[in-house]
Amino acid sequence: GERYLSSLGLKSRLETKEALHSVSLEQGAAYLKETYDLKQTIPEIIKDVLKIVADFYKYEAVLKPGVKETLEWLEEQGIKMAVATSGNKALTEAALERNGVADHFGKIFTCTEIGLGKDEPDIYLAAAEFLGSKPQETIVWEDALHAAQTAKTAGFVVLGVYDESGKDAVPEMKEICEEYFDRMDAWLAGHK
């Protein structure tokens, strides 16, 4: 959102980053149009945002610290994994491939495919069903406050991990999540 608004000569408001963090692309475009009174149509906003996001995922996106090691260990333990993202599927696949972790996941679920954002539990429920587990037996790693709240309310075990975009929500994340970590391998250190 911030890069898109900047491309229009607009400054992103503080609350915009959190508002966009756990919603579908369509929901985010509608939010930007309404909040910033944009003349662009929702499909035009989506197209422009996808171009910006595509460049980021293809050329810039890096894994959070400790993710690769944690995924490798989980796979060695025979734990099945899936991705539940509010991002675009093709871009998520590209970023996972570029970072060498795509093979750890059995499937990628997107809010767009599910038809709802992470403010509803459907994406987590679909992933759990695919994995053959019940919510209370399924760990959800989250870095977004609203998404963590949704997963927790739906009965999932929620582990929080730091993300720069959600730094202002860390105290709330620590309250909501079963455990909260600055990096994923901090969790791994306690489970090896």
For each of these PLM feature ranges, what is it?
Residues 15-16, 57-58, 79, 83, ...:
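Short, contiguous strand/loop micro-motifs
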Residues 19, 84-86, 141:
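Structural motif
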